[in-house]
Design a protein with these regions (language model features):
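Eukaryotic intrinsically disordered, low-complexity regulatory linkers and tails enriched in Ser/Thr/Pro
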Residues: 1-146
Length: 146
């Protein structure tokens, strides 16, 4: 299960949200996004403080023991909210789409030189999770451009 080491409240304008129930955490450089187990937004930050928020959340919330896909940057995605994974014919990037029909994560073809190998590992892992196995760790460096 997702492990929250402590309650985590994030200020959102004049209110706060409890981010402790987030099961997915992604950061792409421009924004930080937290989603719950139903792929609903818990928090979204595209301010200059988004990287700081990402680092703070990474320390407080850990991926689900069985369904957590740990990303290269320390973020994670709950496999149960992934609806599709493919290499975009338009951009050449690997795209993971959520149940909400929005991109969860985009892996850039410039950063990852072996997207064909990487997508195979991710697809196999998703199929195995569907059959009751734990999501394996991915050796991201094996697929990166040198």
């Amino acid at each position: 299960m997702t492990t929250s080491t402590q309650p985590l409240f994030i200020r959102n304008g004049n209110s706060v949200v409890n981010a402790s129930n987030a099961t997915s955490l992604t950061h792409n450089g421009d924004f930080t996004l937290l989603l719950d187990e139903k792929c609903q937004k818990v928090a979204f930050d595209q301010s200059e403080k988004a990287p700081e928020l990402f680092e703070r959340v990474k320390k407080a919330i850990k991926p689900h023991d069985k369904y957590g896909l740990a990303l290269d940057n320390g973020g994670f995605i709950d496999a149960r909210v992934i609806s599709n994974v493919f290499v975009s014919p338009k951009t050449g990037n690997l795209v993971m789409v959520g149940l909400n029909d929005r991109p969860l994560c985009v892996l850039d073809a410039k950063t990852f030189s072996d997207l064909d190998g990487l997508i195979e590992v991710i697809l196999d892992a998703l199929v195995n999770v569907g059959e009751g196995e734990k999501f394996p760790a991915i050796e991201w460096s094996a697929y990166k451009a040198q």
